[in-house]
Curated annotation (Swiss-Prot):
It comes from the Eukaryota. InterPro entries: AAA+_ATPase (IPR003593), ATP-synt_VA_C (IPR055190), ATP_synth_F1_bsu (IPR005722), ATPase_a/bsu_AS (IPR020003), ATPase_alpha/beta_chains (IPR050053), ATPase_F1/V1/A1_a/bsu_N (IPR004100), ATPase_F1/V1/A1_a/bsu_N_sf (IPR036121), ATPase_F1/V1/A1_a/bsu_nucl-bd (IPR000194). Phosphate binds at G209, V210, G211, K212, T213. The modification Phosphoserine is found at S415, S433, S529. It is found in: Mitochondrion inner membrane. It comes from Homo sapiens (Human). Homotrimer. Component of the ATP synthase complex composed at least of ATP5F1A/subunit alpha, ATP5F1B/subunit beta, ATP5MC1/subunit c (homooctomer), MT-ATP6/subunit a, MT-ATP8/subunit 8, ATP5ME/subunit e, ATP5MF/subunit f, ATP5MG/subunit g, ATP5MK/subunit k, ATP5MJ/subunit j, ATP5F1C/subunit gamma, ATP5F1D/subunit delta, ATP5F1E/subunit epsilon, ATP5PF/subunit F6, ATP5PB/subunit b, ATP5PD/subunit d, ATP5PO/subunit OSCP. The modification Phosphothreonine is found at T312. PROSITE patterns: ATPASE_ALPHA_BETA. The gene is ATP5F1B. Residues 1-47 form a transit peptide. Its EC number is 7.1.2.2. Catalytic subunit beta, of the mitochondrial membrane ATP synthase complex (F(1)F(0) ATP synthase or Complex V) that produces ATP from ADP in the presence of a proton gradient across the membrane which is generated by electron transport complexes of the respiratory chain. ATP synthase complex consist of a soluble F(1) head domain - the catalytic core - and a membrane F(1) domain - the membrane proton channel. These two domains are linked by a central stalk rotating inside the F(1) region and a stationary peripheral stalk. This is ATP synthase F(1) complex subunit beta, mitochondrial. GO terms for molecular function: angiostatin binding; ATP binding; ATP hydrolysis activity; MHC class I protein binding; proton-transporting ATP synthase activity, rotational mechanism; proton-transporting ATPase activity, rotational mechanism.
Length: 529
C-alpha cells in the first residue's frame, strides 16, 4: 500500500491525478458542494424488483483513480446519482462500488464493497441504475450472505425472485404502531429489571470480553424456541471465527436446518477483514431482509446487530477516505445522521414489528465516547454488561443498577412486576452504599438490619446469574429459560425473607427459585456427609 502511495507521488501529474487535488480542477464555489444530496428513495414495491445486474444500455464509465477503498470513476454521459451501485467489468469476482460524491468533470467518487486489489485505471464500470439490491424473502432463512446479497455459505445461489434496495425511507407516521408489549426473553435479569419492548431498540453495552455475543446467541436461541419468530443476524465488523462458530452452533441447536425450509434465522456478514464500505453498509443489508418479513409477511422480527460500534467505526473510515473534516474524537461529522437514518427504519408498523438488539462495544469502557453516546438517544432499553460483575463470576454480567428500560412502568408491566423490580434495585443499591463500610470496618460493625440487607442482596446478586443453553459446553451447567411469572415470584420471595435460611451459593447459576431450594438441600447433604 505504501509502495502504491509512493508510485502515485512520483508519477507525473496527469489529468486523472490532478482531479484528486480539488483545487486543481474545481473553482472555490464548487468546492463547498462536493457531496451531492442523498437521493430520495420511493416506497418499496417488492413484486417489481428484478435481479440486481446492470441493464443493457446502462451508463458506462472508466476508473481514473484508486486510493485504497475509494475509487474515482469518470462518465462521459449519464452521471449516476448518489448511492447508486456501479459494477466493475472484466473481473472474476463481482466488485460493486457505491457512489458517495460528485467531484465535477463528470467524475464520481465511490466506496468499494470489496477489496480493490488488481483494479487498474481505464477499467470499464457499468451503472446498475439503482442502489445495491439484495435478495429478500423466506429463501434467505438459513443462509449467509454478504453486503451485496451474494451467498457465502457455499450452498449455491439464493433462489428468490424478490430483490430490494438496501437504502429506503423510514415508515410514515401513519403506518407506525404505538402499542406497548413486553418481549419475554427467558433471561431473569433482563425480564425483571430492564424488560425489552416488542418492536423496540435495545443496546447491549460492554467492553471487550464481558459476554455481549454470548447474550445475543442466547436471545436468538430463546426467541426461536419460545416464540417461533424469525431473526436476522447482521455481523458488522466482528471476528470471522465468531461468525463461523455462531453458524455451526445454530445448526447444532436446530435454529438453522440444512435439510428443509424450517430455519428461523438469516445471517448477513461483513466481518473485520472486509473493507470499510462493506462494514458501513452490511447493517442496512440485514435491516432490508428484516423489513421484508415485517412489511410483506406481517412478522414480528428480531434484528441482531453485532456490533453497532463497528458500523460507526466503518463510517468514520469511509468519511476520512472521502476527505471530510473529522469531528469530536476523530469521528465523522455525519455521525448522528448516519445513525439516525438507519435506526429510524427499525420500528413497529401496523403490519408487524422489528425488535432490534444491538451489541455496542464501548471504547475503553467510556460511555461518554461519541459512538455509544449517539446510539443511546435511539434506544428503548439498555442492558449494560459490567466487568466488575463478570469478575465475580456472575453471568450474564448485566449491571442491575445501570440497565434501564422505557417500559419499566406499572401501567405497562403491572404493579407487581414494577414493585419487585424496584425492591431488588433498592436492596442492591443499599448493599453498594454499605460496601465501603464493610471494606474498612468489616461486617461485624453493621447493625442487624444492615446485615440482613447485605445477606439478601448477595443472594439476589447470585440469583440474577443464569446458565445459558448456548454456553452449556463451556460451563457444564444445563441452560435454563425462565418464564416471567417464575422470575417475579422468585425475587419476591427472596425480598420477603422466605429464603434467609438458605446459603447464598445455592442461588448461583440456577433457573427458577425451586432449583435454588433443591441445590441448598443437595449442598446440606454434601456438607453433612
Amino acid at each position: 500500500m505504501l509502495g502504491f502511495v509512493g508510485r502515485v507521488a512520483a508519477a507525473p501529474a496527469s489529468g486523472a491525478l490532478r482531479r484528486l487535488t480539488p483545487s486543481a480542477s474545481l473553482p472555490p464555489a464548487q468546492l463547498l458542494l462536493r457531496a451531492a444530496p442523498t437521493a430520495v428513495h420511493p416506497v418499496r414495491d417488492y413484486a417489481a424488483q428484478t435481479s440486481p445486474s446492470p441493464k443493457a444500455g446502462a451508463a458506462t464509465g472508466r476508473i481514473v483513480a484508486v486510493i485504497g477503498a475509494v475509487v474515482d470513476v469518470q462518465f462521459d454521459e449519464g452521471l449516476p446519482p448518489i448511492l447508486n451501485a456501479l459494477e466493475v467489468q472484466g473481473r472474476e469476482t463481482r466488485l460493486v462500488l457505491e457512489v458517495a460524491q460528485h467531484l465535477g468533470e463528470s467524475t464520481v467518487r465511490t466506496i468499494a464493497m470489496d477489496g480493490t486489489e488488481g483494479l487498474v485505471r481505464g477499467q470499464k464500470v457499468l451503472d446498475s441504475g439503482a442502489p445495491i439490491k439484495i435478495p429478500v424473502g423466506p429463501e434467505t432463512l438459513g443462509r449467509i450472505m454478504n453486503v451485496i446479497g451474494e451467498p457465502i455459505d457455499e450452498r449455491g445461489p439464493i433462489k428468490t425472485k424478490q430483490f430490494a434496495p438496501i437504502h429506503a425511507e423510514a415508515p410514515e407516521f401513519m403506518e407506525m404502531s404505538v402499542e406497548q408489549e413486553i418481549l419475554v426473553t427467558g433471561i431473569k435479569v433482563v425480564d425483571l429489571l430492564a424488560p425489552y419492548a416488542k418492536g423496540g431498540k435495545i443496546g447491549l453495552f460492554g467492553g471487550a470480553g464481558v459476554g455481549k455475543t454470548v447474550l445475543i446467541m442466547e436471545l436468538i436461541n430463546n426467541v426461536a424456541k419460545a416464540h417461533g419468530g424469525y431473526s436476522v443476524f447482521a455481523g458488522v465488523g466482528e471476528r470471522t471465527r465468531e461468525g463461523n462458530d455462531l453458524y455451526h452452533e445454530m445448526i447444532e441447536s436446530g435454529v438453522i436446518n440444512l435439510k428443509d425450509a424450517t430455519s428461523k434465522v438469516a445471517l448477513v456478514y461483513g466481518q473485520m477483514n472486509e473493507p470499510p464500505g462493506a462494514r458501513a453498509r452490511v447493517a442496512l443489508t440485514g435491516l432490508t431482509v428484516a423489513e421484508y418479513f415485517r412489511d410483506q409477511e406481517g412478522q414480528d422480527v428480531l434484528l441482531f446487530i453485532d456490533n453497532i460500534f463497528r458500523f460507526t467505526q466503518a463510517g468514520s473510515e469511509v468519511s476520512a477516505l472521502l476527505g471530510r473534516i473529522p469531528s469530536a474524537v476523530g469521528y465523522q461529522p455525519t455521525l448522528a445522521t448516519d445513525m439516525g437514518t438507519m435506526q429510524e427504519r427499525i420500528t413497529t408498523t401496523k403490519k408487524g414489528s422489528i425488535t432490534s438488539v444491538q451489541a455496542i462495544y464501548v471504547p475503553a469502557d467510556d460511555l461518554t465516547d461519541p459512538a455509544p453516546a449517539t446510539t443511546f438517544a435511539h434506544l428503548d432499553a439498555t442492558t449494560v454488561l459490567s466487568r466488575a460483575i463478570a469478575e465475580l463470576g456472575i453471568y450474564p454480567a448485566v449491571d442491575p443498577l445501570d440497565s434501564t428500560s422505557r417500559i419499566m412502568d406499572p401501567n405497562i408491566v403491572g404493579s407487581e412486576h414494577y414493585d419487585v423490580a424496584r425492591g431488588v434495585q433498592k436492596i442492591l443499591q443499599d448493599y453498594k452504599s454499605l460496601q465501603d463500610i464493610i471494606a474498612i470496618l468489616g461486617m461485624d460493625e453493621l447493625s442487624e438490619e444492615d446485615k440482613l440487607t447485605v445477606s439478601r442482596a448477595r443472594k439476589i446478586q447470585r440469583f440474577l446469574s443464569q446458565p445459558f443453553q448456548v454456553a452449556e459446553v463451556f460451563t457444564g451447567h444445563m441452560g435454563k429459560l425462565v418464564p416471567l411469572k417464575e422470575t417475579i415470584k422468585g425475587f419476591q420471595q427472596i425480598l420477603a425473607g422466605e429464603y434467609d435460611h438458605l446459603p447464598e451459593q445455592a442461588f448461583y447459576m440456577v433457573g427458577p427459585i425451586e432449583e435454588a431450594v433443591a441445590k441448598a438441600d443437595k449442598l446440606a447433604e454434601e456438607h453433612s456427609s
